[in-house]
């Protein structure tokens, strides 16, 4: 599970991305293309500017739907006093979000360090829904991934690639042709004299119950090897298909996979919808997709933060979930 630490993920030249887009829709072509992209084996990180000494940590997990508004997202998170933000669906060098490195920008607004890794290399540009002072007509990097921002010092950030249970290259929905697979980003965080492992994860939206359970099982195996005896926090968009509060529903097998290894769901989550209509999403079929689970940690005060800023602007099709860790 090694990941090469870098200051910036290695770019893929535009002409190379065009070659990928022209490849035949075959699994072998995708595998070869992915193996040739250095960024898939890298993790970008920047240290937090200062340590944190406190016994209660406020944590958020937020699918920011490409992160069109990092400044507004940071304002909401600051109001919650958040120390650690587990992030999914974050753009870097994408036309649709003004070519911004949205994780780095969010971290800067919060005064946090950050880590970021590549989930998908996007091969088709999407127009921006807001105006930017940029004449470009293509993605500068085409990076879409997951990561975190942190006020806590952290070490050994790592990428965990998940089982491929759906295809985004051979038959991409909505023209979103991509190279890559779903993944998680984990690191070891320190608060005072205590350490714990935090993990941001995004499970496959097009998977069935068995596919999501297989991805969760692979994630848990990797975290067992990485964390050893340290406590673990997992948070993110699990794309579950059960009713709100349904962490005890045996049909969604991923919950049981984690519970069997000592993870708790009940104290970490409120029962409620975490999706909404947004700039890019119709908001149809609202569900609870976003969850925390913990092992070896005391979690309290779970909450859902609406992804709507002070003037009513919707920042994402997912609300943020929050909890407090008592260390």
What are these language model-derived features?
Residues 8-9, 16-44, 91-192:
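Structured beta-strand-rich core segments of catalytic domains in phosphoester-bond hydrolases
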Residues 61-66, 92-93, 176, 208-210:
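Short, flexible loop segments at the rims of nucleotide/cofactor-binding pockets, characterized by
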């Amino acid at each position: 599970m090694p990941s090469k630490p870098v200051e910036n993920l290695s770019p893929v030249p535009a002409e190379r991305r065009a070659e990928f887009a022209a490849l035949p829709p075959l699994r072998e072509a995708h595998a070869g293309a992915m193996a040739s992209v250095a960024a898939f084996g890298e993790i970008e990180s920047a240290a937090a500017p200062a340590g944190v000494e406190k016994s209660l940590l406020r944590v958020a997990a937020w699918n920011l739907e490409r992160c069109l508004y990092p400044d507004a997202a940071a304002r909401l998170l600051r109001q919650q006093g958040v120390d650690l933000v587990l992030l999914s669906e974050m753009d870097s060098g994408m036309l649709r979000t003004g070519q911004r490195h949205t994780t780095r920008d969010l971290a800067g607004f919060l005064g946090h360090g950050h880590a970021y890794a590549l989930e998908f290399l996007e091969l088709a540009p999407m127009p921006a829904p807001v105006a930017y002072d940029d004449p470009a007509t293509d993605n500068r990097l085409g990076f879409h991934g997951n990561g975190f921002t942190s006020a806590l010092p952290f070490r050994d950030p790592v990428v965990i690639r998940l089982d491929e249970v759906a295809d985004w290259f051979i038959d991409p929905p909505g023209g979103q042709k991509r190279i890559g697979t779903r993944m998680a980003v984990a690191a070891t965080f320190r608060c005072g004299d205590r350490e714990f492992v935090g993990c941001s994860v995004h499970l496959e939206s097009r998977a069935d119950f068995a596919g999501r359970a297989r991805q969760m099982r692979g994630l848990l195996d990797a975290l067992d090897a990485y964390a050893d005896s340290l406590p673990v926090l997992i948070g993110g968009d699990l794309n579950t298909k059960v009713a709100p509060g349904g962490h005890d529903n045996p049909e969604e097998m991923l919950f049981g996979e984690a519970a069997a290894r000592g993870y708790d769901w009940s104290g970490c989550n409120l029962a409620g919808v975490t999706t909404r209509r947004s700039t890019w999403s119709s908001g149809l079929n609202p569900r609870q997709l976003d969850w925390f689970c913990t092992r070896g940690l005391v979690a309290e005060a779970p909450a859902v933060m609406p992804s709507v800023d002070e003037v009513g602007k919707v920042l994402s099709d997912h609300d943020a979930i929050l909890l407090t860790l008592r260390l």
